[in-house]
Structures are given as C-alpha cells and as structure tokens.
Amino acid sequence: MSDDVQMTSAPTLFLLMAQYCGKTVVPLDVVCRDFFGHLTERKLLQKCLRGDIALPIVRIETSQKAARGVHLSDLASYIDKRRAAAIRERDQLCGPQ
C-alpha cells in the first residue's frame, strides 16, 4: 500500500463516498466545481498535469478523448494533505492548538 493511501483518513474518504454516492472516480468537472471553483476545468487539468496541484488525473482509456476524473482515494489524500499543511501553518503563526 502506498504512503498516499495510508495518509488518507477514513472520515475524509467516507464523507467523500457519501457525497459522491459511492463512485470510485469523480468526473474532473465535478471535482473542479466542488473544490476548485476559482479554476476552469481546463486550468485545473493543466495544473495537475504540470504538478502544480498534486492530484492524479485518471483516464479510463488511453484515448485522448476519454473522460477524465479523480479517484476518490486520491482526492481524500489530497484534502488531508492540504489540511495538514494548513494546521502546520497555523501552528507556526499561533502556536500549537
């Protein structure tokens, strides 16, 4: 099991499973709308492919036209990592809570 999957907290993953009705892969446009509303879908894809946003994009087929999405475990891991970074930043500014 990779470290990324191990870092995912069960509550985050379970909440996302409930939010997306148990889907394994969430369409990229939905992820964009729900979590990256300040970006267009195209800009989100570019940032992910460049590595600016560490979120793996899944294509079900090798075709360039295949639908793109984000695996639920990857999304949960990304959210948990962003939360951990925010907590570290807060603790540096305000001291541990």
Map each language-model feature to its residues.
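Helix N-cap / beta->alpha transition motif
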Residues: 27-28, 56, 71-74
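Major-groove DNA-recognition helix of helix-turn-helix-type DNA-binding domains
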Residues: 35-69, 85, 90, 94-96
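Positively charged, aromatic-accented nucleic-acid-binding surfaces
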Residues: 1-21, 63-97
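Polyanion-binding surface elements
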Residues: 12-43, 78
